[in-house]
Amino acid sequence: MLISIHVGHEYSFDASLLNRERIFQLENKRDDGIWEANFARPQLERFIAASPYIEAAAITNNLVYSSVRFGISASEGPDARSYMEQVERITPGYTKVFGFELVAGDTDCLKRPEGTLIPESMARKLFGEENPIGKPVYLSEFAGAEGSIIYGLSFEPAYIVGGVFRDFPENTRVKNALYIPIMEKEMMENWHTGLYYCYLLMSTPESASVTTETYMADSRAFLKSFTIEDMRLRPLSDLYFGQPVRADAAPIGNKLRTNMLFFIAILIIGIALVNYINLSIALAPIRTKSITIQKVPRYGSIWSWSPWESRLSPSSSPCFSCYF
């Protein structure tokens, strides 16, 4: 049972995401021949603007998929109850690429520095049955501060809930985290610091290769000045069991191990089936004997009259003769 649950979890990773077949991760190959997933912010925006086949772009930064968690509370003060929650920074397009299903509010809150999206589970944890829209959430680590800088990125001490989305399944790369915005102009002047990752929702799966080929043909000389030799769009369906790339902390699975567990599960089922058949065959004589024993008493009750019949026959014959 545990094996089947684990195997099902692995094989269905990201399968619940809408438009999964049209989502791609943007990657680049450096002059050392190694593929990596991180980019400088202006490099990403330049690529996105160059293609008419991109329907939506999701940009995240180096906190995504990391173990960084903050204390989140719905009130201030020493008595405020905090919960350790994952915090992710995204652009508004992230919700379009991965198909966030909002149950309250909207995603426009991500256009404001203090706006935030939270999952239903977190909303219930922080606010119970109350409507969370418009209410503040506080990062307890920054209590009393006007703002903080972590890894060169700016954080507000409090955020206003602008939207609540339905929780994603656990076996997806999209986390049920507190999402705060990457602002439009953030680090747009820095072409060399690769803090950002990008997923693209393409118009069709086939347009991905056309997009990268066209971009490389037009920008190869420009990219070489940043030691970028090539670029590619890798399908979301190839990422979890695929070859990991440098500087990508997204979850990955081990397909060989999962396949082995799957075959072990099949083997266990096969052995159980063979054992059941062997046991049934071994019990067949016992069952037959049991059936015979159950039938014999009936026949015994019939034959038990035979002695009486033999005794009655001579004595009863005169009676029968007199009668006749």
Residues covered by each model-derived region:
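A short glycine-centered flexible hinge/capping loop motif at secondary-structure junctions
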Residues: 1, 295-300, 318, 322
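Membrane-proximal extracellular/periplasmic loop immediately following the first transmembrane helix
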Residues: 3-71, 80-82, 109, 186-188, ...
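Mid-to-C-terminal secondary-structure elements
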Residues: 63-76, 86-104, 116-253
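Metal/cofactor- and membrane transport-associated sequence elements
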Residues: 205, 262, 272
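Small-residue-rich transmembrane alpha-helices
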Residues: 232, 309-324
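N-terminal membrane-entry
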Residues: 250-268
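Intracellular coupling helices
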Residues: 274-312
